[in-house]
Amino acid sequence: MLMPKRVKYRKTMRGRMKGNSGRGTSVDFGSFGLKALEPAWITSRQIEAARVAMTRFMKRDGKIWIRIFPDKPVTKKAAETRMGSGKGSPEFWVAVVKPGRIMFEADGVPREVATEAFRLAAQKLPIKTKFIVRPDYEG
């Protein structure tokens, strides 16, 4: 599971997901990418499930890049706890994803294989996504 080795602050505020992604919006490493079309918190478990789905379909051919990292802790109070008495303890980690963000990239496989691999990965994610190809791709 992806998570930071250490953080400056154990707990963070929830924040808001306004607007589109400012960076990470172009395919930089591979030839194919999976782009987010909606804002969401993507958990480290969802990222891992998508990664496993892609690598299994691609039969470990090619290369996959994960372009998002879960660096935001989400807290949760224990079950049957009364309100008040402070914030809960960190339970899991999420990556804040805004529309336009490239979440995964792949290379070294045919276009049809990449399309299907990203389709399987998208089923593991809680948002609408789009398969995109690098503009200068020759295939």
From Swiss-Prot:
Q: Give an example GO biological process.
A: translation
Q: Which InterPro entries match?
A: Ribosomal_uL16 (IPR047873), Ribosomal_uL16_bact-type (IPR000114), Ribosomal_uL16_CS (IPR020798), Ribosomal_uL16_dom (IPR016180), Ribosomal_uL16_sf (IPR036920)
* GO terms assigned for molecular function: rRNA binding; structural constituent of ribosome; tRNA binding
Domain of life from the UniProt record: Bacteria
Segments traversing the membrane: none
Give the CC-aspect GO terms: cytosolic large ribosomal subunit
List the keywords (alphabetical): Ribonucleoprotein, Ribosomal protein, RNA-binding, rRNA-binding, tRNA-binding
Q: Which NCBIfam families match?
A: rplP_bact
Query: What does the record give as the function of this protein?
Result: Binds 23S rRNA and is also seen to make contacts with the A and possibly P site tRNAs.
Q: Which PANTHER family match?
A: 50S/60S RIBOSOMAL PROTEIN L16, LARGE RIBOSOMAL SUBUNIT PROTEIN UL16M
State the family named in the UniProt similarity comment for this chain. Answer: Belongs to the universal ribosomal protein uL16 family.
Query: What is known about its subunit structure?
Result: Part of the 50S ribosomal subunit.
What's the protein called, per UniProt? Large ribosomal subunit protein uL16
Gene name tied to this protein: rplP
